[in-house]
């Protein structure tokens, strides 16, 4: 009789970035499969889990979402410690949130130097209505940051379910050192999806 027992692996993923950029929406959309228009601002830390099965292994994503207001920065260690991946998130429609990534990255790396970094641009559905030159400028800056961070870069929209599942597939591939088979998307104006081979 075949052994029916499954291996269980838990992967802690931290989500950080400025407030009101869509961190909680991404987490809820991924875990529950639906977009919540009424998502409220996170005060402190949010936490959700989602378990998926791959072959004979059950993988639980333990997702930690830090409220983006500066008064919660003292909770950053709770989100970063033991995380195997950190999603550094910004709102594609607000350039100031991309500029903040440098400081978030610096602080997070103080608590965790080994987590796989992924740079996530949210609200792609708003971004795609921007003039072409604005899209080019923001994409160029995001690529510069991703390169400096040695991070994969993904633009997503939780309200339109664009690239949400793929973010966590990239996390899996990077954490377990698997070949990422998701096709990359590189054209400005499209929902960018570029990953680096570690």
Swiss-Prot record:
Binding site for GTP: 17-24, 65-69, 122-125
Keywords in alphabetical order: Cell cycle, Cell division, GTP-binding, Mitosis, Nucleotide-binding
The protein, known as: Septum-promoting GTP-binding protein 1
GO biological process, one term: cell division
A single MF term (Gene Ontology): GTPase activity
Cellular component GO terms held in the UniProt record: mitotic spindle pole body; spindle pole body
Matching PANTHER family: PTHR47978
Function: GTP-binding protein essential for the induction of septum formation at G2 and pre-START stages of mitosis. Acts via the cdc7 protein kinase pathway.
CDD domains listed in its UniProt record: Spg1 (cd04128)
Pfam family, one: Ras
InterPro entries in the cross-refs: P-loop_NTPase, Small_GTP-bd, Small_GTPase, Small_GTPase_Tem1/Spg1
Subunit text: Interacts with cdc7 and cdc11.
Region Small GTPase-like, residue ranges: 6-198
């Amino acid at each position: 009789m075949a052994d029916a027992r499954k291996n269980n692996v838990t992967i802690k993923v931290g989500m950080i970035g400025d407030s009101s950029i869509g961190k909680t929406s991404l987490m809820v959309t991924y875990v529950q499969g639906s977009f919540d228009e009424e998502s409220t601002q996170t005060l402190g830390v949010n936490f959700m889990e989602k378990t998926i099965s791959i072959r004979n292994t059950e993988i639980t994503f333990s997702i930690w979402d830090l409220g983006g207001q500066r008064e919660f920065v003292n909770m950053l260690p709770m989100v970063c410690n033991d995380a195997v991946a950190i999603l550094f998130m910004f709102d594609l429609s607000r350039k100031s949130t991309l500029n903040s990534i440098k400081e978030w990255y610096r602080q997070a790396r103080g608590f965790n130097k080994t987590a796989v970094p992924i740079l996530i641009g949210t609200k792609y559905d708003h971004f795609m209505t921007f003039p072409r030159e604005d899209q080019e400028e923001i994409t160029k800056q995001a690529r510069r940051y991703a390169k400096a961070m040695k991070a994969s870069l993904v633009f997503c929209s939780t309200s339109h379910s664009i690239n949400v599942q793929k973010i966590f597939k990239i996390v899996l591939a990077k954490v377990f050192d698997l070949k990422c088979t998701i096709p990359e998307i590189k054209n400005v104006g499209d929902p960018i999806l570029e990953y680096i081979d570690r």
